[in-house]
Amino acid sequence: MRHQLRIPLLSKPADQRKALLRGLTTQLIREGRVTTTKARAKALRNEAERMISLAKDGSLASRRRAIGYIYDKKLVHSLFEKAKERYGDREGGYTRIVRTVSRKGDNAQMAIIELV
C-alpha cells in the first residue's frame, strides 16, 4: 500500500518511473538544465538534490551510491570534484524550476529545471 508516500506516480509503473528519473537526473547533471513537464520537474528536483548532497559529502560510500544511480560513471566523478566548491555554502536548494509555456500537442504545463 502506498499510504502517505510523497513521490508522484507520473502515470508509470515503478520500474519505468525510476528509469525515467535516473535518466532525467543524469541529463540535468550533465547539461545543467532540462525542459520537461512540471510534474516531472518536481519529482526530479528531489532526486537531483539527493545526488548533489551525496557529492558534497564526498565519502566512498556516497560515491558508490551515486554511481549506482547516475548512468554515467565519468559524470559522477566530475560531479564529486565540483560539488564542494560550487555548493559548499548551500544547505539545499540546488535546483530552480521555472515555468514555461504549455506544450502545443496536449497543453501540458512545461517547466525548465536548472542547477543553481
Curated annotation (Swiss-Prot):
Family: Belongs to the bacterial ribosomal protein bL17 family.
SUPFAM superfamilies: Prokaryotic ribosomal protein L17
Family annotation (PANTHER family): LARGE RIBOSOMAL SUBUNIT PROTEIN BL17M, RIBOSOMAL PROTEIN L17
Organismal lineage: Bacteria, Bacillati, Cyanobacteriota, Cyanophyceae, Synechococcales
Organism expressing this protein natively: Prochlorococcus marinus (strain MIT 9215)
Subunit structure: Part of the 50S ribosomal subunit. Contacts protein L32.
GO terms assigned for molecular function: structural constituent of ribosome
Protein name: Large ribosomal subunit protein bL17
Highest rank taxon of the organism: Bacteria
Alphabetized UniProt keyword annotations: Ribonucleoprotein, Ribosomal protein
A GO term from the CC aspect: cytosolic large ribosomal subunit
Gene Ontology terms: biological process: translation
Pfam families: Ribosomal_L17
